[in-house]
From Swiss-Prot:
InterPro entries: Asp/Glu-ADT_sf_sub_c, GatC. This is Aspartyl/glutamyl-tRNA(Asn/Gln) amidotransferase subunit C. GO terms for biological process: glutaminyl-tRNAGln biosynthesis via transamidation; regulation of translational fidelity; translation. Belongs to the GatC family.
Length: 95
């Protein structure tokens, strides 16, 4: 598969990128090089290779899922210019 100048202009238009006429040949070459590399990757034999998400084995640290109030509600509300009944008080915007 190869990209022509019209396709480069179409991609630029869809991406809302301004591309000058003199830039089109360079971008066309870049896109064709990327597509050639992707085609080269598709030829690699991956039969029997386990899929992985990272080259380094990683595990997420797990914690107990406990519902709490965050333990800092008073500190958070202390930053508010106005509060009422432990809630932020904001100006009315809709009548």
């Amino acid at each position: 598969m190869s990209v022509d100048a019209a396709t480069v202009r179409r991609i630029a238009q869809l991406a809302r990128i301004a591309v000058k006429d003199e830039e089109v040949p360079h971008l066309q070459g870049e896109l064709n090089a990327m597509l050639a590399f992707i085609e080269q990757l598709s030829e690699v034999d991956i039969e029997g290779v386990e899929p992985m998400t990272s080259v380094i084995p990683m595990e997420m640290k797990k914690r107990q899922d406990v519902v709490n109030d965050g333990e800092i509600a008073d500190l958070v509300l202390a930053n508010a210019p106005a509060t009422e009944d432990h809630f932020f008080l904001v100006p009315k915007v809709v009548e």
